[in-house]
């Protein structure tokens, strides 16, 4: 894990990027923007102590949204390999549930 600091307006990742890390927002504001959003306001807002960027890592697929800092922000980044090592130690039922939930969210987004 590593601590990263971002400035307001800076992208943490963009839609289409390979998901290499999962993020935990420690401080600041991060907006999640779907590719179809041409507005200034995000589709979703990430709050402190919330995780984001997980779907691309869980599914090994390109990111479906962009994450942009709405203020200066500090995040903890967990690499794909660190995440997978933690998941492998988890109960097999929880591993399967995690993948199913992620796929369900992606399917719902694809239908919009």
Name each model feature, range by range:
Residues 1-112:
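Cytosolic regulatory regions built on CNB/CRP/Popeye-like sensor folds
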């Amino acid at each position: 894990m590593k601590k990263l600091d971002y400035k307001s307006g800076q992208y943490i990742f963009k839609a289409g990027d390979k998901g290499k890390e999962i993020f935990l927002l420690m401080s600041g504001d991060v907006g999640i923007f779907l590719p179809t959003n041409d507005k200034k306001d995000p589709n979703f807002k990430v709050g402190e102590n919330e995780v984001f960027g997980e779907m691309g890592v869980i599914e090994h697929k390109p990111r479906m949204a962009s994450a942009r800092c709405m203020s200066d922000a500090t995040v903890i980044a967990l690499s794909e390999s660190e995440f997978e090592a933690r998941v492998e130690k988890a109960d097999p039922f929880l591993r399967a549930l995690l993948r199913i939930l992620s796929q369900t969210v992606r399917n719902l987004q694809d239908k919009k």
